[in-house]
């Protein structure tokens, strides 16, 4: 018998049946486990992505929180510096005012001391002048004066000296 060039042979049918059986076996034994592995891997990747997104959002929230805390700290620091500057200026003003008051007190005391010293010197000069006048008058009169005459001469002399000024 001659074999046909194109035809279905038993070998070909067995190969197709064997291929189909191997396909079913592989599908039953390998396809589902591989599919489960792929599905598991896909779920792991999705959960990792979700965790990454969650961590990113938490990081952004923490960043915003830290930035707000930093801004608050900066504002608080500036307020502290401002208050310290105000207190320093007030203290400086108090010190300057106290120094001015002390200077005025010292100046007034010095003026008072000068006036007292001036009066003292004037009184000493008056006494010296009256002694000199008495001495000159006694030389002129050549006699001693009694106390009442002496005081009268002194007062007249002082009046004349005061008017001469």
Curated annotation (Swiss-Prot):
| Highest taxon of source | Bacteria
GO MF annotations in UniProt: proton-transporting ATP synthase activity, rotational mechanism; proton-transporting ATPase activity, rotational mechanism
Tell where it localizes: Cell membrane
Cross-referenced NCBIfam families: ATP_synt_b (TIGR01144)
This chain's function reads: F(1)F(0) ATP synthase produces ATP from ADP in the presence of a proton or sodium gradient. F-type ATPases consist of two structural domains, F(1) containing the extramembraneous catalytic core and F(0) containing the membrane proton channel, linked together by a central stalk and a peripheral stalk. During catalysis, ATP synthesis in the catalytic domain of F(1) is coupled via a rotary mechanism of the central stalk subunits to proton translocation. Component of the F(0) channel, it forms part of the peripheral stalk, linking F(1) to F(0).
Q: Membrane topology per the record?
A: Single-pass membrane protein
Assembly and partners?
F-type ATPases have 2 components, F(1) - the catalytic core - and F(0) - the membrane proton channel. F(1) has five subunits: alpha(3), beta(3), gamma(1), delta(1), epsilon(1). F(0) has three main subunits: a(1), b(2) and c(10-14). The alpha and beta chains form an alternating ring which encloses part of the gamma chain. F(1) is attached to F(0) by a central stalk formed by the gamma and epsilon chains, while a peripheral stalk is formed by the delta and b chains.
Q: Which UniProt keywords apply?
A: ATP synthesis, Cell membrane, CF(0), Hydrogen ion transport, Ion transport, Membrane, Transmembrane, Transmembrane helix, Transport
Q: Which InterPro entries match?
A: ATP_synth_B-like_membr_sf, ATP_synth_b/b'su_bac/chlpt, ATP_synth_F0_bsu_bac, ATP_synthase_B_chain
Q: Name one Pfam family in it.
A: ATP-synt_B
Q: Which GO terms describe its cellular component?
A: plasma membrane; proton-transporting ATP synthase complex
Assigned protein family: Belongs to the ATPase B chain family.
Xref: CDD domains? ATP-synt_Fo_b (cd06503)
Presence of keyword Cell membrane: yes
TM ranges are 5-25
> Gene3D superfamilies from the entry?
6.10.250.1580
The name of this protein is ATP synthase subunit b
């Amino acid at each position: 018998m001659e074999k046909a060039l194109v035809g279905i042979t038993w070998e070909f049918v067995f190969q197709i049946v064997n291929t189909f059986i191997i396909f079913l076996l592989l599908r039953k034994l390998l396809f589902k486990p591989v599919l489960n592995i792929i599905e598991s891997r896909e779920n792991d990747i999705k959960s990792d992505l979700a965790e990454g997104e969650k961590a990113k959002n938490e990081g952004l929230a923490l960043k915003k929180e830290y930035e707000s805390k930093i801004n608050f700290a900066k504002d608080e620091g500036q307020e502290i510096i401002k208050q310290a500057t105000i207190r320093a200026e007030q203290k400086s003003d108090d010190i300057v005012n106290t120094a001015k008051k002390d200077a005025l007190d010292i100046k007034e005391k010095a003026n008072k001391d000068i006036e007292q010293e001036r009066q003292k010197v004037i009184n000493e000069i008056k006494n010296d002048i009256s002694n000199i006048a008495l001495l000159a008058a006694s030389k002129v009169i050549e006699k001693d004066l009694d106390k009442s005459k002496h005081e009268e001469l002194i007062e007249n002399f002082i009046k004349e000296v005061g008017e001469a000024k």
